[in-house]
Amino acid sequence: MEKMNKGFTVWFTGLSGAGKSTISHLLKEKLKEFGRDVEILDDDVVRTNLCQDLGFSEQDSDITIQRIAFICKLLTRNGVAVISAAISPYREARDKARNEIGNFVEVYVKCPLEVCVERDAKGLYKKSFKGEIHSFTGVSHPYEEPQNPELILETNKENVEESTNKIIKKLIELGYLNTKEDVYSSEEEGMIIKRLSGLGYIN
C-alpha cells in the first residue's frame, strides 16, 4: 500500500488555550476534502469518556497519553487519518506515542502563556490560579516543548486557516496526501483517457 493511502496521526501538543481543538476541527473538514476518513481525539472528550479516573499530575498525564496513543495506533493501522488534540506536556510520553503509532506527525501549537490565559475559554486557568485545579500545565506544572516537531504553528501570529493550510502542505510533503490536482492513479488516468477517446472527445 502506498504511503498516501495509509493512516496517519497528526499529534497536536501545546498549552491549554493554544488553539489545538479549533485547528483540529477545521483540519478534519479539509482532510475530508481529500477523501480521507478522519477521527478526532480531543483532550476533553477523552478525559470525559476514557480518563474519568485521572487528574493532571505527571503520572496521570502519561497514562492519558498512553490511552490516546493506543487508540491512535489502532485507527492509524486501519487507514484512518487521526487527529489527537491533547496538551501532552511531557516529551518522553510524546516520543513513546510516536514510536507506538508509527505514522506520526507532531505539530507544536505554540502560543505564549499570557495569551492562553487571556483566551481561557474553559476557565481552567482561572480555577488553577485559585487552587481549584492542581498540577495544571503551564501554571503549577511544566510544559516541555518539542525538540524536533514536524511543524510549529504560532497561533498568536497566524489565524486558524493559515495554520491548517500549513498542516495540509506538510502532509503533502510527507506523502500522506495527494495534491488535489493528482487525485487519480496512473491506471485510473489511463481508463479515463481511453473512455474519452472512445467517445470522440480526444484523439
What is each model feature region?
Residues 12:
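Hydrophobic anchor at the beta1->P-loop junction of P-loop NTPases
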